[in-house]
């Protein structure tokens, strides 16, 4: 009998990752480009849909590119692309579908189950929206678990015999989460959670981008903030510089031909950025990391001295200033035994392994991220399930009527920490009718909350005298109907082959256009021999003809030929550079369209 495979997916704001259990050990699956993470970016170009690195390269230059869609999960907001509206679930489903497809190819089998992680602060609607995205992508979501909990699960897999208190410091590309967990005898219990949903590595990138824009404006008296091509290069260069400064004290950002000045001359910009300057520019971001840590510790009712391990999660935790802050706050050396980009997906895969019976002796106890209450007389939010209650859980309480002979009660369920219901988020409401006439306070109405292992809630109301009852499942109150989900699943399946063909052809044309541009630049260079210029002009003509004729077989052959030609040109340029003693330094250069540089 073939063993069941359940994918562990970290569906991140900036990057996503997938892992599975093989021989009782988690392994991270590489994507088709050989990378272990996938940018959570989707780009539309006519019939073509790009996901991941290919989409990220068009993030600024193509206005029909969507990133950080996770921020909209569980809301009614939609994105309009090429005159068509897409829900956040639909965009997320394209990322999940891409991950599912390459996982199936890697493992050589069909896969239809997954465990997906979400931030600890995701509410019920956001969790249900994540499940819906999985369904649209053709996945049964077996479990939704919190990202910090997944990270702790990954960390604890080899240390089940040690009782420990763990602080999980999770700084990703777009969100920041802190959790305090108790781990003992194979059981993980979340004691507290805190965080900032709008703080992540992207903010550090933006600081460098702003610094570069000002530096270029000061030196060349030009504003590049509206120049899409230039901004894409600045974004790529900023991310590279940030990553580089995690390992060296100084890096050089080189941006040749970044724009044209007022006289039509090309602008070549180069500037050093050292770690001290970078840390000074971003000190306000570092400061914002403190409060969530202190809040989580306060709520856990533990002191920092009680913490045994600080687990770093998310690529942004590689920054030395972040690590120094953690040491300063906790007095502990941060634990780097796990890859921060992959640890959440690994934890999700382990949970999948538990559900599939591949791994034993682990019990995952998750918690409710916010207090769940009902609205009572005077608009008060009366809590039934406090924040950080372990789930699954079921709790009930008896209420009564607010007026004499009241025939029905309206049950309004809210989520949040405020005392008044109006100040919290309304999750849903329903009515229990048919209450027998009686003075106020006499009827007994039992309200029962039930939350399953995915954090999805149902509420039941019963008249204890008549035994009449009614209930509601809080099911994506801000999102999609089942009909919409079914329609999207059908559309995704019907267009799968067509999408793949169109994607290949469009990528080929994009490569050809990029090569034509590169060849044209080389032809304009003075020190290139005329013979080589003639060869390049010939290739420009061949590429252009094949592209315009939509002869994709010929175009593919010509693209390969030109890439070989450019490789030889690169060798020539390298020899020229080696002859110049003034050009012997390590630079960080922006990515070109064809550059697949390492992403966080």
UniProtKB/Swiss-Prot annotation:
Protein name: Chaperone protein DnaK
Modified positions (Phosphothreonine) in chain numbering: 175
Induction: By stress conditions e.g. heat shock.
Keywords, sorted A to Z: ATP-binding, Chaperone, Nucleotide-binding, Phosphoprotein, Stress response
Cysteine pairs bridged by disulfides in the record: none
Keyword Transmembrane: no
Compositionally biased spans, kind Polar residues: 591-600
Region (Disordered): 572-600
Any one Gene Ontology molecular-function term assigned to this protein's record: ATP-dependent protein folding chaperone
InterPro entries linked: ATPase_NBD, Chaperone_DnaK, Heat_shock_70_CS, HSP70_peptide-bd_sf, Hsp_70_fam
């Amino acid at each position: 009998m073939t063993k069941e495979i359940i994918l562990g997916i970290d569906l991140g704001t900036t990057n996503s990752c997938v892992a599975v259990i093989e021989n009782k050990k988690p392994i991270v699956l590489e994507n088709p480009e050989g990378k272990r993470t996938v940018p959570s970016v989707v780009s539309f170009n006519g019939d073509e849909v790009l996901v991941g690195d290919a989409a990220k390269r068009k993030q600024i230059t193509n206005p029909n590119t969507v990133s950080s869609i996770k921020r909209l999960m569980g809301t009614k907001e939609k994105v309009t692309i090429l005159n068509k509206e897409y829900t956040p679930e639909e965009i997320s489903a394209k990322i999940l579908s891409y991950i599912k497809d390459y996982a199936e190819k890697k493992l050589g089998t069909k896969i239809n189950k997954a465990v997906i992680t979400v931030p600890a602060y995701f509410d019920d609607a956001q969790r249900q929206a994540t499940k819906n995205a999985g369904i649209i992508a053709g996945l049964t979501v077996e479990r939704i678990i919190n990202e910090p909990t997944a990270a702790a699960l990954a960390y604890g897999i080899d240390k089940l015999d040690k009782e420990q208190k763990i602080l999980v410091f999770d700084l990703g590309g777009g969100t920041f989460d802190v959790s305090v967990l108790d781990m003992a005898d194979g059981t993980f219990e979340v004691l507290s959670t805190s965080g900032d949903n709008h703080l992540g590595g992207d903010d550090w990138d933006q600081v460098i981008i702003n610094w570069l824009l000002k530096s270029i404006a000061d030196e060349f008296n030009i504003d590049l903030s509206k120049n899409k091509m230039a901004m894409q290069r600045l974004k790529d260069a900023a991310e590279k510089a940030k990553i580089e400064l995690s390992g060296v004290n100084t890096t050089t950002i080189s941006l040749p031909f970044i724009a044209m000045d007022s006289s039509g001359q090309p602008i070549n910009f180069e500037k050093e950025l050292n770690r001290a300057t970078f840390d000074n520019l971003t000190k306000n971001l570092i400061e914002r990391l403190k409060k969530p840590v202190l809040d989580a510790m306060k709520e856990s009712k533990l002191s920092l001295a009680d913490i045994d391990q600080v687990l770093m999660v998310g690529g942004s935790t590689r920054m030395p200033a972040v690590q120094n802050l953690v040491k300063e706050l906790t007095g502990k050396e941060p634990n780097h035994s796990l890859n921060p980009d992959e640890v959440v997906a690994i934890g999700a895969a382990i949970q999948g392994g538990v559900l599939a019976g591949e791994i034993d002796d682990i019990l995952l106890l998750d918690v409710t991220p916010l207090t769940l209450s009902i609205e009572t007389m005077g608009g008060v939010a009366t809590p039934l399930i406090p924040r950080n209650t372990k789930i699954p859980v079921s709790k009930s309480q008896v209420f009564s009527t607010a007026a004499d002979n009241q025939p029905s009660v309206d049950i309004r369920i809210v989520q949040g920490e405020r005392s008044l219901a109006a100040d919290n988020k309304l999750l849903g409401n329903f009515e229990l009718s048919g209450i027998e006439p009686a003075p106020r306070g006499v009827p007994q109405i039992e309200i029962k909350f039930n939350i399953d292992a995915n954090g999805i809630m149902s509420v039941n109301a019963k008249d204890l005298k008549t035994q009449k009852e009614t209930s509601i499942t809080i099911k994506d109150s801000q999102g999609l109907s089942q009909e919409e989900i079914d329609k999207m699943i059908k559309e995704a399946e019907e267009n799968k082959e067509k999408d793949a063909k169109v994607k290949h052809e469009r990528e080929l044309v994009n490569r050809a256009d990029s090569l034509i541009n590169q060849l044209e630049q080389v032809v304009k260079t003075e020190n290139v021999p005329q013979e080589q210029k003639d060869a390049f002009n010939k290739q420009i003509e061949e590429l252009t003809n094949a592209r315009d004729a939509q002869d994709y077989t010929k175009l593919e052959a010509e693209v390969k030929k030109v890439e070989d030609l450019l490789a030889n040109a690169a060798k020539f340029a390298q020899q020229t550079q080696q002859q110049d003693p003034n050009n012997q330094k390590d630079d960080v250069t922006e990515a070109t369209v064809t550059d697949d540089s390492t992403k966080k």
